[in-house]
């Protein structure tokens, strides 16, 4: 499952097709859809100017058929992207997903359709402990991660709820020893 927080608050958009979610992430996944089936869980605030409108969400569901999209409404807590990722992970795991791709809504996925298989294979080699990630214009730390539900089983969340937003990437980069970090810099996940 891909888990993606998204908001249209504070943007000069009037339609869902103007969003980063539509124009960047979903279009790139549609163009270079991974070779394994995926479900994308999108977390949005119940009072979001665009996503809270059912007809707007249905536009996206109608335009993208290569993958399933599930919209998860959240209680508004502006700036707390960590809570959204953690809640989306709960939903995905409850529905039987083992692997969680933690992404932003403005990411372009790799053009290699097997990138997700490569990430999963690397995690399996480590008994699904740690993470796999691509390169996201940051040579110091990874910022978009594939985790197995084992991470949730151990910690109870993807990111510590106290973080809210800043330093959540740093947490995942620092929590695991190097041998459990599968940083595949040849696979670009760019924004």
Where are these regions (language model features)?
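Short, acidic, metal-binding catalytic loop of nucleotide-sugar glycosyltransferases
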Residues: 18-37
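Short beta-strand/loop segment that forms part of the nucleotide-sugar
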Residues: 36-49, 72-76
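A short, glycine-/small-residue-rich helix N-cap motif at loop->alpha-helix starts
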Residues: 76-85, 89, 165-166
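Active-site nucleotide-sugar/metal-binding loop of Leloir-type enzymes
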Residues: 86-99
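Short beta-strand-to-loop acidic/aromatic patch adjacent to the donor-nucleotide binding site
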Residues: 97-108
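Conserved donor-nucleotide/metal-binding helix-loop-beta segment in metal-dependent transferases, i.e.
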Residues: 111-131
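Short beta-strand-to-loop element that shapes/binds the nucleotide-sugar donor at the catalytic cleft/hinge
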Residues: 129-144
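A short, conserved alpha-helix in the catalytic core of glycosyltransferases
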Residues: 151, 164-182
């Amino acid at each position: 499952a891909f888990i993606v927080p998204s908001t249209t608050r504070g943007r000069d958009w009037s339609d869902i097709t103007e969003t980063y979610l539509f124009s960047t992430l979903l279009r790139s996944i549609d163009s270079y859809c991974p070779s394994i089936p995926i479900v994308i869980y999108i977390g949005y605030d119940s009072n979001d100017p665009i996503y809270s409108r059912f007809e707007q969400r249905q536009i996206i569901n109608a335009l993208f058929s290569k993958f399933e999209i599930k919209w998860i409404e959240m209680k508004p807590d502006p700036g707390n992207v960590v809570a959204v990722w953690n809640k989306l992970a709960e939903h995905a795991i409850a529905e039987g997903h083992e692997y969680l791709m933690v992404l932003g809504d403005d990411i372009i996925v790799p053009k290699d359709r097997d990138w997700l298989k490569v990430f999963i294979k690397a995690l399996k080699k480590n008994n699904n402990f740690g993470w796999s990630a691509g390169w996201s214009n940051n040579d110091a730390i990874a910022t978009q991660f594939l985790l197995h539900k084992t991470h949730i089983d151990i910690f109870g969340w993807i990111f510590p709820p106290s973080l809210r937003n800043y330093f959540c990437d740093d947490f995942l980069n620092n929590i695991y020893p190097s041998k459990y970090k599968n940083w595949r810099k040849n696979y670009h996940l760019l924004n």
